[in-house]
């Protein structure tokens, strides 16, 4: 054992390059002496515990030797010598156990005593701090009071219990108070000013000999201590004048309040005495408002005050109509009828109580007949709505709707206006095909008095504001969710119904021309442009689809006359702005059909045959027909039902024939355009998200098809599209694509335009099929059968020798750099053309569709054979993603990321013999660190990505009689361990390895639980790891 200890000492002396031992570093980093002492005691107890365990193991080995001797076995001389020391080992074991108990008890007592001392010291320090703060506050209070004149007089004359101070010393204190309690200096910040004051207070508390205000801080401190002990500042006298003034102000305010209360009580009592005998038989009087009524006996002109109070307080009851009259029963009946009508409409007005009430009654009744009662929208009764329709024919059509309006025929309601929230939509009959939709106007009022309640101004304001947010109001309106309805009660200053203008169309459709715009085409165009500039911006468009296939109205044209909602100019202009935001200038000239949330706007290309629709000319009205979409029942916010459940679509201008679209009657198409894409130039300027080195080819060739974005309709007009495909347009109708010498030939016109069967003029047959005007071809074929991305594409060649290539806008993808060998790239095709490698292959994306996706749903990927290889197979991209009765779904193609290269190997070139347990193993030599994932200073591997990793470690034990324990740790968890000990002071290796599934951010490191590690320039102790598979 002595030799072993000497060897350990020699080894430790050889490690002079270490500045501090781990124990010394822990002691130096301790926050307090008690923590350092506690750490030192704990480490000593741990070492003693391990020593006891080793002695117990030696005792067990010696007992085994003794048993073997008893059994007659022969032992070697070393074993016999060890058996002779059995008693000594027992003695050492008992001594070590007793020593452990003693040290444990002593350490506990010492720690308790030290904690008590620390607590006492902390309390004393806290008390001194509190005392300093208390003294500073007392000094500040004294100095603040010394600034008052009456306090200075008391100290100069020694009055009111104040001690006598010479004027010189008093001047010192006054000057010092101005320094420590200064007025706010705007040139300095509050922090700087308070810092200066704190310096004065600090020097005062210290009592230094520094000069201040003509004396020293020590002298000022003595003067202040005398003032504090004098007792004058225990109760500083306050000036009597200020007290009396404050009391007088309080008394005057209290007297005013009492007088106001008494006057209000007297007035309320006099009013109750006057009003109570007249309206005592009426039980409906609301007595809550009696205290708010102000009545004057000297008031003679009651009519003027009644008009003012009527406009100000319309919520009181009409009590003058129900007072008993001796004239006859007719007035009673009229008053009762007026009372009932006021209860129905819940209109209340102020009661008029005066001595000359009988004289005012005829005037009030006449004004009541002339004035128009107001019915709030929130007070409607669902069972008896009071809206009206304009004509008997329209009334009959309205009654044919599922939930007809109830029309009342009471005479007393004729001169009344409809409430501002009531909307009436006229329904057009089948005979009036070319007549425009009209909104019926209510009957004219007999007269409008100047005393009309103020709430009609709100109605006018609502009518003014109803022109701008029509697209929002249309979703919550009371009728059939229209954006262009006008209230029936509005008094129009011009003619409401504009005469319709016929437009030369094959199938004329009813177009709503009721508009608030001027009739002059120039003024109308300017108004439209102004409104379009107001609503221009970024929008989110989504067309709601009717997902219920069982509704007959959504699949079968209704036999009833179609009820379309009148659309205002704002909705049409919003559709125009929607179209400008929605169409992203496709490179192929096509006729897009744009679907927005309010209406379906159909436009045609300039190449289309037939007449075209222009929105700003005087020959066509400024409205575009917008079909009303029925909302789900759960989405309706009002009890009023929609007026129609059938749909009617406007025909596309320039249509050559009308086709009854029976196959499209059950088609449901959902468009969800989240946001318009930025221009192509911005996307090309953006840095590609993948590393550069491989390229990706996408070519898109699309025949012109009608985008199937309409909801179930009655008629759809199909336009004949010219086969234009950008730069690859040929006058003979042939469309050639630079995709392995591929040519398209136009098919004859049919019900659904589709391209003809394509033909391949070179090697390789075409895979896939064409649906919806898109040809999907596989480009994922290598000679070995592996499906990967094409890093290059050969020059397209046609059998006739002609060359044609589509010039399409594209996004460029630069690939990952791979080292090429023998003209071969990993996971890619061999080069089979003489053209070599194209550096910048572009990705062409089709812009013929207007559906949306996180990138762009219209960017359908088309792949084609490069002309290399005879055997082609269908890839997942080649599967057609469209069907004749469904929308085109997006296919997103992203390049596969390259697996990261992660590997490291570290070693130790010096011994590691810490004095404490569970220390991290830090390495001083880095053999390899691929990926920069191993931290040499901490000895930790940081997991960069999720995946499966392999770790191997070998640790050579220092030649001491101490076993070696090494743990492989993941964060703070022990994964695997290694052990080395043969019972002799010699070098042994502790090694192990593990295959682990790690997550990004995990840390792998080695921990030396116990023992010492041997290190040399031959690097016996190493730690390595690498990434096996990436998730």
UniProtKB/Swiss-Prot annotation:
One of its GO terms (molecular function) is RNA binding. Residues 1-27, 364-458, 500-520, 605-658, 830-876 are annotated as: Disordered. Residues 897-1031 form the C1q domain. GO terms for biological process: cell differentiation; negative regulation of cell growth; negative regulation of translation; positive regulation of dendrite morphogenesis; positive regulation of dendritic spine morphogenesis. GO terms for cellular component: centrosome; cytoplasm; cytosol; mitochondrion; nucleoplasm; plasma membrane. It is found in: Cytoplasm; Cell membrane. Ca(2+) 1 binds at residue 982. SMART domains: C1Q (SM00110). Gene3D superfamilies: 2.60.120.40. Residues 608-646 have a biased composition (Low complexity). The modification Phosphoserine is found at residues 852-853. Belongs to the caprin family. PANTHER family: CAPRIN-2 (PTHR22922:SF5), GPI-ANCHORED PROTEIN P137 (PTHR22922). The C1q domain is essential for the function in Wnt signaling. Homotrimer; via C1q domain. Found in a complex with LRP6, CCNY and CDK14 during G2/M stage; CAPRIN2 functions as a scaffold for the complex by binding to CCNY via its N terminus and to CDK14 via its C terminus. Interacts with LRP5. Interacts with LRP6. This is Caprin-2. It comes from Mus musculus (Mouse). The gene is Caprin2.
């Amino acid at each position: 054992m002595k030799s072993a200890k000497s060897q350990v000492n020699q080894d430790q002396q050889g490690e002079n390059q270490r500045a501090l031992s781990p124990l010394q570093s822990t002691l130096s980093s301790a926050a307090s002496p008690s923590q350092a002492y506690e750490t030192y005691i704990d480490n000593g107890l741990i070492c003693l515990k391990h020593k006891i365990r080793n002695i117990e193991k030696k005792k067990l080995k010696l007992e085994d030797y003794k048993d073997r001797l008893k059994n007659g076995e022969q032992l070697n001389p070393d074993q016999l010598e060890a058996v002779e020391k059995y008693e000594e080992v027992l003695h050492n074991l008992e001594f070590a156990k007793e020593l452990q108990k003693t040290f444990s008890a002593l350490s506990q007592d010492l720690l308790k005593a030290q904690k008590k001392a620390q607590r006492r010291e902390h309390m004393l320090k806290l008390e001194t701090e509190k005392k300093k703060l208390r003294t500073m506050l007392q000094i500040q209070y004294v100095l603040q009071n010394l600034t008052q004149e009456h306090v200075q007089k008391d100290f100069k004359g020694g009055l009111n219990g104040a001690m006598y101070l010479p004027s010189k010393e008093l001047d010192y204190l006054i000057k010092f108070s101005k320094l420590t309690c200064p007025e706010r200096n705007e040139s300095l910040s509050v922090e700087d000013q308070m810092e200066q004051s704190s310096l004065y207070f600090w020097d005062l508390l210290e009592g230094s000999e520094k000069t201040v205000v003509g004396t020293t801080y020590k002298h000022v401190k003595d003067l202040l201590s005398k003032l504090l002990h004098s007792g004058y500042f225990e109760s500083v006298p306050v000036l009597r004048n200020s007290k009396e003034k404050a009391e007088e102000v309080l008394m005057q305010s209290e007297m005013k309040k009492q007088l106001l209360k008494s006057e209000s009580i007297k007035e309320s009592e006099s009013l109750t005495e006057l009003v109570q005998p007249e309206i005592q038989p009426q039980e409906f009087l609301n007595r809550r408002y009696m205290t708010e009524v102000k009545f004057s006996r000297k008031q003679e002109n009651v009519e003027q005050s009644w008009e003012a109070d009527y406009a100000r307080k319309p919520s009181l009851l009409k009590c003058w109509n129900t007072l008993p009259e001796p004239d006859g029963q007719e007035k009673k009946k009229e008053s009762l009828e007026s009372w009932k009508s006021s209860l129905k409409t819940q209109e209340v007005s102020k009661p008029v109580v005066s001595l000359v009430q009988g004289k005012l009654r005829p005037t009030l009744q006449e004004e009541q007949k002339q004035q128009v009662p107001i019915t709030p929208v929130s007070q409607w009764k669902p069972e008896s709505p009071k809206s009206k329709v304009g004509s008997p024919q329209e009334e009959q059509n309205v009654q044919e709707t599922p939930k007809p309006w109830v029309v009342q025929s009471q005479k007393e309601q004729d001169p009344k206006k409809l409430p501002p929230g009531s909307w009436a939509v006229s329904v057009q009959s089948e005979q009036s095909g070319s007549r425009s939709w009209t909104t019926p106007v209510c009957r004219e009022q007999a007269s409008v008095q100047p005393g009309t309640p103020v709430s009609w101004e709100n109605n006018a304001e609502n009518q003014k504001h109803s022109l701008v947010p029509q697209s929002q109001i249309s979703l919550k309106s009371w009728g059939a969710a229209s954006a262009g309805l006008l209230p029936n009660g509005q008094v129009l200053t011009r003619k409401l119904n504009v005469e319709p203008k016929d437009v030369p169309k094959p199938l004329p459709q009813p177009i709503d021309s009721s508009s608030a715009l001027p009739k002059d085409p120039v003024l109308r165009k300017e108004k439209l442009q102004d409104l379009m500039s107001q609503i221009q911006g970024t929008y989110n468009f989504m067309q709601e689809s009717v997902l219920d296939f069982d509704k007959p109205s959504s699949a079968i044209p209704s036999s009833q006359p179609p009820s379309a909602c009148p659309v205002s100019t704002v909705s049409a202009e919003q559709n125009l702005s929607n179209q400008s935001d929605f169409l992203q200038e496709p490179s192929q000239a096509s006729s897009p059909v744009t679907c927005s949330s309010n209406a379906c706007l159909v436009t045609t290309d300039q190449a289309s045959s037939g007449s075209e629709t222009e929105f700003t000319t005087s020959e066509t009205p400024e409205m575009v027909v917008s079909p009303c979409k029925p909302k789900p029942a759960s989405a309706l916010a009002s009890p009023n039902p929609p007026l129609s459940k059938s749909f009617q679509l406007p025909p596309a201008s320039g249509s050559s024939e009308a086709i009854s679209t029976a196959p499209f009657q059950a088609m449901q198409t959902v468009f969800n355009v989240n946001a318009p894409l930025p221009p192509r130039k911005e996307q090309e300027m953006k840095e590609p998200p993948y590393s550069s080195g491989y390229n990706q080819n996408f070519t898109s060739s699309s025949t012109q098809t009608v985008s199937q974005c309409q909801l179930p309709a009655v008629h759809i007009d199909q336009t004949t599209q010219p086969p234009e495909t950008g730069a690859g347009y040929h006058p003979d109708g042939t469309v050639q694509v630079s995709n392995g010498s591929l040519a398209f030939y136009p098919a004859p016109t049919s019900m659904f335009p589709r391209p003809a069967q394509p033909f391949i003029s070179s090697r390789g047959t075409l895979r896939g099929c064409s649906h919806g005007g898109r040809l999907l071809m596989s480009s994922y074929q290598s000679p070995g059968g592996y499906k990967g991305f094409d890093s290059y594409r050969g020059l397209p060649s046609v059998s006739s020798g002609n060359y044609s290539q589509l010039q399409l806008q594209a996004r460029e993808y630069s690939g990952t750099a791979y080292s090429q060998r023998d003209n071969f790239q990993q996971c890619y095709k061999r080069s089979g053309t003489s053209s070599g490698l194209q550096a910048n292959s572009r990705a062409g994306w089709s812009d013929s569709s207007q559906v949306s996706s996180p990138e762009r749903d219209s960017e359908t990927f088309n792949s084609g054979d490069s002309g290399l290889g005879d055997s082609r197979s269908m890839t997942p991209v080649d599967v057609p993603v469209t069907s004749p009765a469904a929308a085109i779904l997006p296919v997103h193609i992203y390049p596969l990321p390259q697996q990261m290269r992660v590997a490291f190997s570290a070693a130790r070139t010096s011994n590691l013999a810490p004095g404490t347990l569970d220390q991290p193993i830090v390495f001083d030599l880095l053999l390899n660190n691929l990926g920069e994932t191993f931290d040499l200073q901490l000895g930790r591997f940081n997991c960069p990505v999720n995946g499966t990793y392999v770790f191997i470690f070998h640790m050579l034990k220092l030649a001491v009689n101490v076993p070696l324990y090494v743990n492989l740790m993941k964060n703070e968890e022990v994964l695997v361990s290694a052990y080395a000990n043969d019972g002799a002071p010699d070098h042994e290796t502790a090694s192990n390895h593990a295959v682990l599934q790690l997550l990004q951010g995990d840390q792998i490191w080695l921990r030396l639980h116990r023992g010492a590690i041997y290190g040399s320039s031959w690097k016996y102790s190493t730690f390595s790891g690498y990434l096996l598979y990436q998730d």
